[in-house]
């Protein structure tokens, strides 16, 4: 055989291998699980708890301001992995800027994978197949950076097989719920038979601190963020009668908004994670979101809808002002953000886990109301993540009929 024909034969072999390795269908969400830590704090009394727990009750005017901030958030309650008795052991954490990173790490490093594993157990149970069939694990968090990392610890807690392909997404912030869905799509579609366990877990104690008159950004963060974890099972070519496909991940794209790096940024210091947010963040997001939407539709050869109300919506609830301005910019009816506002009210902003919670809320409500699809009876929708950078994750979803 000549060298030319031999090379051609090898190329055919490579192409055949490549084709055999890839799935036939689109990546699909097949199961969802969520988990909370045990301590529930009503938002209308959170200022009392926060100023008492941080030994700041003498800051009367600042407390009044913080209470007003809390009551404007449209949050009803939040969950945390700490209570007042727990925080008494850590006066360095409840101060504003005392060195406390070691203690925060000691709490988060075991706590994050443990909470994530709780959500994963629920997702695996709903999926209905043995955990030994999980081929990939994508774990996401913005706290508890360590080695071996949180993906390793979560896999160990779950008893996943030792050759699971693991990925850890650290320190991406609020847009990362979209990031992990983008990763899951690529993994599921490029590995035939893959079943990807996606886990997002967040603990706010990495950035909890006492109030300071000169740093209201952190006060705003303390009024918004809550603890939580969520998990998905994602795979292509679902097994009929065994797996329950809900949402197809048709397209996933990331966009960085130019000249917006200083709008939202966080920095890890000896005193924990410091939070900075410009008052321009709602306007920055709302002015750029439509371009991201148009891009994701055009990238798959679809014409963007003339009326954005024809879609179902899963935007990350960065805060009330962000939702209000995006809703106004896109001329959306108030009910379009119902699932997002429900999760914001029930749980606060849980960073990367939020959009997965909203996906769960939407599919459950759709089933309860007897609608035709998991996406509020609609066929097409979008999931949006917003976070530091400013970075936007735009996910085009196709909702399947309710089973």
Curated annotation (Swiss-Prot):
Record flagged with keyword Transferase: yes
One Gene Ontology term from the biological process aspect of the record: polyketide biosynthetic process
Active site: 174
Pathway: Secondary metabolite biosynthesis; flavonoid biosynthesis
GO MF terms, alphabetically ordered: acyltransferase activity, transferring groups other than amino-acyl groups; protein homodimerization activity
Enzyme Commission numbers on file: 2.3.1.-
InterPro entries recorded: Chalcone/stilbene_synt_C, Chalcone/stilbene_synt_N, Polyketide_synthase_type-III, Thiolase-like
Record Gene3D superfamilies: 3.40.47.10
Binding site for CoA: 281, 318-321
pH influence on activity: Optimum pH is 7.5.
Pfam families cross-referenced by the UniProt entry: Chal_sti_synt_C, Chal_sti_synt_N
Annotated site residue numbers, Determines the polyketide chain length and product specificity: 207
Domain of life: Eukaryota
Keyword annotations from UniProtKB, A to Z: Acyltransferase, Flavonoid biosynthesis, Transferase
Keyword tRNA processing listed: no
Subunit structure: Homodimer.
Other known facts: A.arborescens is a medicinal plant rich in aromatic polyketides, such as pharmaceutically important aloenin (hexaketide), aloesin (heptaketide) and barbaloin (octaketide).
Function comment: Catalyzes the iterative condensations of 8 molecules of malonyl-CoA to produce aromatic octaketides, SEK4 and SEK4b, the products of the minimal polyketide synthase for the benzoisochromanequinone actinorhodin. May be involved in the biosynthesis of the octaketide barbaloin.
Family of this protein: Belongs to the thiolase-like superfamily. Chalcone/stilbene synthases family.
UniProt protein name: Octaketide synthase 1
Organism: Aloe arborescens
């Amino acid at each position: 055989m000549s060298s030319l024909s031999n090379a051609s034969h090898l190329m055919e072999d490579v192409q055949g291998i490549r084709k055999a390795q890839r799935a036939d269908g689109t990546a699909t969400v097949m199961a969802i699980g969520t988990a909370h830590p045990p301590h529930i704090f009503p938002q209308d009394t959170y200022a009392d708890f926060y100023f008492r727990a941080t030994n700041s009750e003498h800051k009367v005017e600042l407390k009044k301001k913080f209470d007003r901030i809390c009551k404007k958030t449209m949050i009803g309650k939040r969950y945390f992995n700490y209570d007042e008795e727990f925080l008494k052991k850590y006066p360095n954490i409840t101060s504003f800027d005392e060195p406390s990173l070691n203690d925060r790490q000691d709490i988060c490093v075991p706590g994050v994978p443990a909470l994530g594993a709780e959500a994963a157990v629920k997702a695996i149970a709903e999926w209905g197949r043995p955990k030994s069939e999980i081929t990939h694990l994508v774990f996401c968090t913005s706290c508890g950076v360590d080695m071996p990392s949180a993906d390793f610890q979560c896999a160990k807690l779950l008893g996943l097989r030792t050759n699971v392909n693991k990925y850890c997404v650290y320190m991406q912030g609020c847009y990362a719920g979209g990031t992990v869905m983008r990763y899951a799509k690529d993994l599921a579609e490029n590995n035939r038979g893959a079943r990807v366990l996606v886990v997002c877990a967040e603990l706010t104690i990495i950035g909890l601190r006492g109030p300071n008159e000169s740093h209201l950004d952190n006060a705003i963060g303390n009024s918004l963020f809550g603890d939580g974890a969520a998990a998905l099972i994602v795979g292509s070519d679902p097994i009929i009668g065994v797996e329950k496909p809900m949402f197809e991940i048709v397209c996933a794209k990331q966009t960085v908004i130019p000249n917006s790096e200083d709008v939202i940024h966080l920095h890890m210091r000896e005193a924990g994670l410091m939070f900075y947010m410009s008052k321009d963040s709602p306007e920055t997001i709302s002015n750029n979101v439509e371009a991201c939407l148009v891009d994701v539709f055009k990238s798959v050869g679809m014409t963007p809808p003339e009326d954005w109300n024809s879609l179902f919506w899963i935007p990350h609830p960065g805060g009330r002002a962000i939702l209000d301005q995006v809703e106004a910019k896109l001329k959306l009816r108030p009910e379009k953000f119902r699932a997002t506002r429900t999760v914001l009210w029930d749980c606060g902003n849980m960073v990367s886990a939020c959009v997965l919670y909203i996906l769960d809320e939407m599919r459950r409500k759709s089933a309860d109301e007897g609608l035709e699809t998991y996406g509020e009876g609609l066929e097409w929708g979008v999931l949006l993540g917003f976070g530091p950078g400013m970075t936007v994750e735009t996910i085009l979803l196709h909702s399947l009929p309710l089973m």
